[in-house]
Amino acid sequence: MKKLHIVGNWKMSLNKEDSLKLAHNIKLINNKDNLNIEVAPTSLYLAEIAEILQDSDISVISQNFDFQNLGSFTGGICLDQLKEIGINKTILGHSERRSNFNESNEQINNKLEIILNSDLDVIFCFDSLEQVPFDILSTNLKDNSKLKLTLAYEPTWAIGTGKTA
């Protein structure tokens, strides 16, 4: 039987106390045999949430990463830093990153190439086929049999409307 894949993106919705409480409660979920659960807390609490969930089958993932590596990039978090705290997957191309932070398809595609050439996994979000860089994906799919890529259809026209996508 296939597992149901559930990703909880906590965004910036919870303070530290509520984040830690939620992590402890999620850890108590029973009957996870058919579930693949991943949570994406704010980057400020990633390490603590990962520590709480380390002995469970719940994965902690990053909401975003900076395409630069270590250096003078105020406010960024790079793949090496994520790996240091045990994070091995990230979300990329989320509609809020595109709209609120003006991340362009070009920037997102640059980040996608970086992560596809790393040993981290990625959830690539898109709301139209025009946002999917098939050329990048096909090249990397051919060259990397260990590639772990999840495509997440996120139709912005349906978010918060009650309409089914």
Q: Where would I find each of the regions flagged by the language model?
A:
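Active-site loop-to-helix "anion-binding N-cap" substructures in soluble metabolic enzymes
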Residues: 1-165
